[in-house]
A protein has these predicted regions:
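Local sequence-structure signature of Cys/Sec-based thiol-disulfide redox active-site neighborhoods
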Residues: 1-31
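Residues that form or flank phosphate/diphosphate-binding pockets in enzymes
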Residues: 17, 40, 66
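Structural micro-motif
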Residues: 50-59, 69
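Non-catalytic interaction surface on structured domains
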Residues: 26-27, 47, 73
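Non-catalytic, surface beta->alpha helical segment in thiol-disulfide oxidoreductase systems
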Residues: 60-88
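Charge-patterned, long linear interaction tracts outside catalytic cores
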Residues: 90-96
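Thioredoxin-like thiol-disulfide oxidoreductase module
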Residues: 35-53, 79-90
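Conserved short-loop catalytic and cofactor-binding motifs
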Residues: 11, 33, 46, 68
Length: 96
């Protein structure tokens, strides 16, 4: 079982590229939603992230974890890998 990771992106977004590169470097599969030209996807992103309107917005097992800076902070603090492992094991993801 793997964690379900979703990322909302837009075209020409350096932060999006950076977040996807981090996930890819860890071998984490993710579903990408390009919301740049899709107003419905953008509304969905904002609603799911509880108001997050910047790109990217990242979700692990449906829980919002923030954007590129937040996911890199989690990695730098040594909290990203355990978070992904918990999600893969089916345990509740705690992002705070």
């Amino acid at each position: 079982m793997t964690a379900r990771v979703e990322i909302y992106t837009r075209d020409y977004c350096g932060y999006c590229t950076r977040a996807k590169a981090l996930l890819s470097s860890k071998g984490v599969p993710f579903t990408e939603y390009d919301a740049s030209m899709d107003p419905d996807k953008r509304r969905e992103m904002i609603q799911r992230s509880r108001g997050g309107a910047t790109y990217p917005q990242i979700f692990i097992n449906g829980r919002p974890v923030g954007g590129s800076d937040e996911i890199h902070d989690l990695d730098r603090e040594g909290r990203l890998d355990p978070l992904l492992a918990e999600a893969a094991a089916g345990r509740k993801v705690r992002t705070t």
